[in-house]
A protein has these predicted regions:
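Beta-strand segments within the central parallel beta-sheet cores of soluble alpha/beta enzyme folds
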Residues: 1-3
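Non-catalytic alpha/beta scaffold blocks inside enzyme catalytic domains
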Residues: 6-168
Length: 168
């Protein structure tokens, strides 16, 4: 049972998957936290300004400031407050990528590109519950068709992007 309505929300906080957080619940606005993570990652600095919240992201999409969005592992057209605004923003955005296990979600209606992702039970991983207890999730069945684990989709994209960004 998830108190937040998002089964792995705590895991997202621990890994720094929210726009205002760094891994380990570190605050992106805290200079000491940024320096610690930058040193661990082997980079000089991290941006001082945190990213947009989910609500701010959809506001920026709706007013045309954001021209492309990649949505992974969530269904904001169904789960975020003010669904009318979210759906209007998705309809306005010129390019919407959705990484999702199901093509019938409310958000999928707005996708220009649907990347088939494996669902729970079709991939290995961990889930952190509200008590911060980490559980290993074992793959029970193979993912259908071209569906892959989320990390594999992300790594493949990053490698292709890196190859295109290499100077000639």
């Amino acid at each position: 049972f998830s108190l937040t309505g998002q089964p792995n929300a705590m895991g997202g906080r621990e890994t720094g998957s929210l726009s205002n957080l760094l891994p380990g619940h570190r605050d992106a606005a805290n200079a000491e936290h940024r320096a610690d993570v930058a040193q661990y990652w082997g980079v000089d600095t991290l941006p001082e300004k945190p990213g947009l919240s989910a609500i701010e992201l959809f506001e920026q999409m709706q007013n045309g400031s954001i021209k492309a969005v990649w949505i992974a592992c969530t269904n904001p057209a169904q789960s975020l407050p003010d669904q009318t605004r979210v759906r209007d923003a998705l309809a306005t955005c010129p390019f919407v990528v959705l990484q999702e296990a199901f093509r019938t979600t409310e958000t999928a209606r707005f996708a220009d590109l649907l990347l088939p992702a494996a669902s729970w039970g079709e991939k290995e991983g961990t889930v952190t519950n509200s008590e911060r207890r980490i559980s290993h999730v074992r793959k029970a069945v193979a993912a259908p068709g071209e569906a892959r684990a989320d990390w594999a989709i992300t790594v493949d994209f990053a490698q292709r992007l890196e190859a295109r960004l290499q100077p000639d």
